Amino acid sequence: MDRTTLPYGLFGLDIDPYKEFGATVELLSFLPSDFFPSVRDLLDTASALYRESLESSDHCSPHHTALRQAILCWGELMTLATWVGNNLEDPASRDLVVNYVNTNLGLKIRQLLWFHISCLTFGRETVLEYLVSFGVWIRTPPAYRPPNAPILSTLPETTVVRRRGRSPRRRTPSPRRRRSQSPRRRRSASPASQC
């Protein structure tokens, strides 16, 4: 693949927006395009789960920052699409631009939003394990693989892919302590706890 056809190639730079998070564009490309929810659904999810931390001036995590940037980028694309729709005279050209934005750029934004929301929700390691598991599953001939693809929300309990290094120690359950009959005081939430 030459630099002009790289999905995120720009000005001769081979920039992969997932690299710093341990993933790659290729790893996400194993997931079919219809796997990713609509941009609207992903934005609603991000807003419902992470609105406070996304709107906060505090730096919460690289995933929050990447999510903010993807949301802002989509907003700018929608502004451009609206401008094109209002100013391009030729309906065929207008449709080509709108379809290109929705199909190509929309998919990239859906992938970015899904990846960062999933990392915040399930943890980066779990999402990476899921991507590897799905990649292995999809490349295995149907006769030799389980009928159903791995599911992200159940992956921590059923994954076959293991992290390198020591396996986590199992703790033996401690005896139950008697609970105090008096109500506990709740600490007030600090600004850092929003993240």
Curated annotation (Swiss-Prot):
Gene3D superfamilies registered for this protein in UniProt: Viral capsid, core domain supefamily, Hepatitis B virus
Taxonomic superkingdom: Viruses
Primary localisation category: virion
GO BP term (any one): viral penetration into host nucleus
Modified residues (Phosphoserine): 167, 174, 182
Stored Pfam families: Hepatitis_core
Family: Belongs to the orthohepadnavirus core antigen family.
Name under which the protein is recorded: Capsid protein
